[in-house]
Amino acid sequence: MIKNPFSGIILKEENKDNRGSAEFQVVSFTNRIRRLTSHLELHKKDYLSQRGLRKILGKRQRLLAYLSKKNRVRYKELIGRLDIRETKIR
């Protein structure tokens, strides 16, 4: 398995106070997405993992939409730090 370069972000921010924050959850989902993506590069026919990846992507997308509506500055900072694209809001 490939070592995840973003695991340090979670360890740095892991306090009992902010585990439920939207930013922490997005970082956690991003780590899981990257880990599953590297797994699926090796195992292309693992359809259960593909389904799990789609579910996590949807959860992260909903959290990012919530965060962009509530606090646009924190949203921009987070997507810049995680190097993910800005979501299209309907």
From Swiss-Prot:
Domain of life the protein comes from: Eukaryota
Classification via InterPro entries: Ribosomal_uS15, Ribosomal_uS15_bac-type, uS15_NS1_RNA-bd_sf
Keyword Chloroplast included in the entry's annotation: yes
GO annotations of cellular component type: chloroplast; ribonucleoprotein complex; ribosome
Pfam families assigned to the protein according to its UniProt record, in alphabetical order: Ribosomal_S15
GO molecular function: structural constituent of ribosome
Gene Ontology BP annotations: translation
Record keywords: Chloroplast, Plastid, Ribonucleoprotein, Ribosomal protein
Subcellular location: Plastid, Chloroplast
Signal peptide, first to last residue: none
Major subcellular location class: plastid
Family: Belongs to the universal ribosomal protein uS15 family.
NCBIfam families registered for this protein in UniProt: S15_bact (TIGR00952)
The protein, known as: Small ribosomal subunit protein uS15c
Organism of provenance: Panax ginseng (Korean ginseng)
